[in-house]
Amino acid sequence: MVKLTKRIGGLVLRLAAFGAALAALIVMITSRERASFLAISLEAKYTDMAAFKYFVIANAVVSVYSFLVLFLPKESLLWKFVVVLDLVMTMLLTSSLSAALAVAQVGKKGNANAGWLPICGQVPKFCDQITGALIAGFVALVLYVLLLLYSLHAVVDPFLLQKS
Amino acid sequence: MVKLTKRIGGLVLRLAAFGAALAALIVMITSRERASFLAISLEAKYTDMAAFKYFVIANAVVSVYSFLVLFLPKESLLWKFVVVLDLVMTMLLTSSLSAALAVAQVGKKGNANAGWLPICGQVPKFCDQITGALIAGFVALVLYVLLLLYSLHAVVDPFLLQKS
């Protein structure tokens, strides 16, 4: 019975991670706002920033991976390799979220030392939607860290909870 | 004999990771250049960018952790917990390197969509030293990923190399 609940627990975490990564992807891709600035009409979209494009690619990869792993048979030896792939996905989410956050922070506050003005004053809705995508990306990351700790706990017992 | 070589291998990886994280920290902290721009004298330093400050803090944490773990007794049960801490350090290095890279990329190329001009034209030596710090940070990250795979391999055998 315990094994069954553990297995279902793992699948639920993976399903939630799939949902969060997909949401982050969709919210980021659909973030766009038109604004006029000194009589010039501008449109802000996620493709304007390399870090946001990286965020989209990373969450797309994680979404596909999370979906495929749901169909891996229980007895498959590949589950041993899934631990390493979970690690890779966790690093990909960590990296893309951090890069997008760093650039979003500059977009929100600007950087006086570098002479970069903030942009969120002109395109507030765009910035709010980017924030939403980053939150969804953070949820996906937390779920993947839980998945990793869950896999590590099953094999390494790092918190010494199992009676030896 | 195999166990001894494995143990020494682990310690050498940790020592190298300690050296790389410390180098990244020192190179980033000492990066500074004075430049004059439209008769204004400016000094570029790592504290100008939040992402670079984050990079310094992360590599400082990893350096201290890597140094302390070197003194952990072989038989200690804490080694089981070190796998989780190695994961945390790997994520910290991934995150801080990605954030610093995202901002450095904007510093090097600017971003026309956001109206941000590149800065490396005015402070080329500063940018070169930042690049050096990011390379050292990347080496520390690669070493930590190897350490993680090494720990996972010892307990999970994800590449199914051990004869069952």
From Swiss-Prot, chains A, B:
Disulphide bridges, residue numbers: none
User: Per the record, what ranges lie on the membrane's Cytoplasmic side?
Assistant: 1-7, 73-80, 151-164
Give GO cellular component annotations, separated by semicolons.
Answer: plasma membrane
Has the keyword Cell membrane been applied to this entry? yes
Localization in the cell: Cell membrane
The parts of the chain that form a coiled coil are: none
The superkingdom of the source organism is Eukaryota
Q: Which residues cross the membrane?
A: 8-28, 52-72, 81-101, 130-150
Q: Name the UniProt key words of this record, in alphabetical order.
A: Cell membrane, Membrane, Transmembrane, Transmembrane helix
Query: In which broad location class does this protein mainly occur, judging by the first location in its UniProt entry?
Result: membrane
Q: Identify the residue ranges that face the Extracellular compartment according to the record.
A: 29-51, 102-129
| Tissue specificity comment | Expressed in the stele of the root.
Its record classes its membrane topology as: Multi-pass membrane protein
Q: One Pfam match, by short name? A: CASP_dom
Q: Which InterPro entries match?
A: CASP/CASPL, CASP_dom, CASPL
Q: How does it assemble?
A: Homodimer and heterodimers.
Member of which family?
Belongs to the Casparian strip membrane proteins (CASP) family.
Which PANTHER family did the record assign? CASP-LIKE PROTEIN 1U1 (PTHR36488:SF8)
Enumerate the NCBIfam families for this protein. Answer: A_tha_TIGR01569
Protein name, please? CASP-like protein 1C1
Source organism per entry reads Arabidopsis thaliana
